[in-house]
Amino acid sequence: MNRLKPVAIIKIDITNMSPLCGKTLIDIDFRSRYNCMVVGIEDDMGNLQVTEAQRKFQAGERIWVVGEEADLAMLKMGI
């Protein structure tokens, strides 16, 4: 029997220096590259929006990401 691996959700701040800033999920190939899924974008007012693949990430936003704990740890190191 296959055991499911634990998943978690984390919040990542997008800064001017972030490699995600100014790019879309498509540009980054986010799901394939990080094996995680962006489930929402929070603006500086705290409003949460559903992600669209063509929308560019902007400095000051936060993204909410779901994935296996090991993949999330690798994502945080790479950003």
Regions picked out by a protein language model, each given a short descriptive name:
Residues 1-12:
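Long, charged amphipathic helices and adjacent flexible linkers at domain junctions
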Residues 11, 16-79:
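Cytosolic Rossmann-like ligand/nucleotide-binding regulatory domains
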